[in-house]
């Protein structure tokens, strides 16, 4: 399917709905978790690690079960998980630590996000048995 054929009203709608639900989820995670440990914004970390896990699950499921429509893939991955995970907030929080003269915290924060998200994505693929596809 060409990119032009994917530009349908339904696809715009499902991406937008998914993104709204993902962003609301991220906002609620921030509200509930960020106050727990101010030095490490746990809401952003949770959003990125949970999103990493769920994208692994989704990619695995969609790869194994080819009967899912493009709309479901766009809703789940591009919409919901795109709205849930947040590279811009993560970047701002790391730079905030650097500007506060806390380079060790900045490096640690970046490392935890990267390692956590990549590990969670792999675990998501393992959950649905999708790693054997690429072996």
Curated annotation (Swiss-Prot):
Na(+) is not transported, but it plays an essential structural role and its presence is essential for fluoride channel function. Na(+) binds at residues 82, 85. GO terms for cellular component: plasma membrane. One of its GO terms (biological process) is cellular detoxification of fluoride. It catalyses: fluoride(in) = fluoride(out). HAMAP family: FluC. This is Fluoride-specific ion channel FluC. The gene is fluC.
């Amino acid at each position: 399917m060409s990119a032009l054929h994917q530009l349908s009203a339904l696809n715009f709608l499902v991406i937008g709905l998914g993104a709204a639900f993902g962003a609301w989820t991220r906002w609620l995670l921030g509200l509930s978790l960020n106050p727990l440990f101010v030095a490490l914004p746990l809401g952003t970390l949770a959003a990125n690690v949970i999103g990493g896990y769920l994208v692994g699950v989704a990619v695995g499921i969609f790869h194994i079960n080819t009967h899912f429509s493009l709309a479901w893939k766009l809703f789940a991955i591009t919409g919901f998980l795109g709205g849930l995970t947040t590279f811009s907030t993560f970047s701002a929080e790391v730079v905030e630590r650097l500007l506060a003269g806390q380079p060790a915290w900045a490096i640690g924060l970046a490392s935890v996000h990267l390692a956590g998200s990549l590990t969670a994505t792999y675990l998501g693929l393992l959950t649905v048995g999708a790693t054997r596809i690429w072996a």
